[in-house]
């Protein structure tokens, strides 16, 4: 057990600090402190000694050096179970410090300000705080260290129960928390510096995330899971109503948001198992939803709806006629919320800045490492298209082809989508053979009574053989948009010409694994 006799206190987040220090002084614990923390404790009438009085050395360099002193770090690092340590401490006038309450300068909060300067950021890099935390955490068998105000209550309870002592097991748990905190802090600084320098892929990379919540389970009930949010980006998954978000819900919400956010205003995407099962945009959100749902109403059952716009009463009424897991949109009107409230299990997530909420990096974990890439946000404009067929597209054809192209990029490879000018008709997703995706997309459209005659076909990658083109012609589609780049492009173009199809190349592939 660790007897608490002397505490070093220096905090930026002063939540609960006067309460815990008042508790400590009532139990005879000496308090040492600096700067603003000293002022706050003194103002509250708590007996506290300045660190410079304790060390006999003044604060210097405008406060940059306050606690970096042998009397502080000797008191934190000295192992009082080691006779040599005790002897050296006594000969140098160093006394043990058995409790540290420290949290760090608000670096992340500072650099998230839109007008932050490099100088502001640098002045909010804490040096003394991490040093004290690490010293105390290293010597956790003799020192208790608190860096999270949420731990103050449990500390006080154990202190009271054990007559001023804390178990080494508890101290070890606090120490582990400290090293997570200091690692996260340094990661945030590293990320900020790399961003300032324009370095996307440094030789060594760390990511700082805070645990937002423990999830009931992962992708399947036998898997554990938790949700973490990055320090520099507040989580968008704040539900207005509905059941607790599951692991799979979060994946589908993210996908539905991603699809809708990169399409025109009022666009609607319906997602199931990370695949869109309907995408559309119309004059209103209601029109878009009705068009998107027609693509595959069976798969839309229990799906997640992404809406690039505001959900009004009429849209809410139509959505709630169906079983859906949730809706993510720019906003919801009060009338819409009243309607959704009658279906309390539907999860509702608003993202006010729909166009600005996209993260740049895509991370994929492997059993033996981590893959990082920039996200596939690039869009092709009509002027970049290369018309390779003899038959030329009209302006309306180009609009339809662009819509097909902007849809297919969100579908799992091998991906084929049949569309009209503003809604999907049939989706062939995730097949190992491209021609199978061609046939699947047409079959799914026909299954729900949608005709693909005269439709536009988007393919996420090139056609390796002409069989895909023959299959598209067989169902009566009008035009094809694809990246090109196959060694058999000439054969594929010839097939399009034989069937009187329009074909355009984008020069950009959109694999999605």
From Swiss-Prot:
GO terms for cellular component: cytosol. It catalyses: (6R)-10-formyltetrahydrofolate + 5-amino-1-(5-phospho-beta-D-ribosyl)imidazole-4-carboxamide = 5-formamido-1-(5-phospho-D-ribosyl)imidazole-4-carboxamide + (6S)-5,6,7,8-tetrahydrofolate; IMP + H2O = 5-formamido-1-(5-phospho-D-ribosyl)imidazole-4-carboxamide. Keywords: Hydrolase, Multifunctional enzyme, Purine biosynthesis, Transferase. It comes from the Bacteria. Transmembrane segments: none annotated. Its EC number is 2.1.2.3, 3.5.4.10. The IMP cyclohydrolase activity resides in the N-terminal region. Pathway: Purine metabolism; IMP biosynthesis via de novo pathway; 5-formamido-1-(5-phospho-D-ribosyl)imidazole-4-carboxamide from 5-amino-1-(5-phospho-D-ribosyl)imidazole-4-carboxamide (10-formyl THF route): step 1/1; Purine metabolism; IMP biosynthesis via de novo pathway; IMP from 5-formamido-1-(5-phospho-D-ribosyl)imidazole-4-carboxamide: step 1/1. PANTHER family: BIFUNCTIONAL PURINE BIOSYNTHESIS PROTEIN ATIC, BIFUNCTIONAL PURINE BIOSYNTHESIS PROTEIN PURH. Belongs to the PurH family. HAMAP family: PurH. This is Bifunctional purine biosynthesis protein PurH. InterPro entries: AICAR_Tfase_dup_dom_sf (IPR024051), Cytidine_deaminase-like (IPR016193), MGS-like_dom (IPR011607), MGS-like_dom_sf (IPR036914), PurH-like (IPR002695). One of its GO terms (biological process) is 'de novo' IMP biosynthetic process. GO terms for molecular function: IMP cyclohydrolase activity; phosphoribosylaminoimidazolecarboxamide formyltransferase activity. SMART domains: AICARFT_IMPCHas (SM00798), MGS (SM00851). It holds the Pfam family AICARFT_IMPCHas. Residues 1-147 form the MGS-like domain.
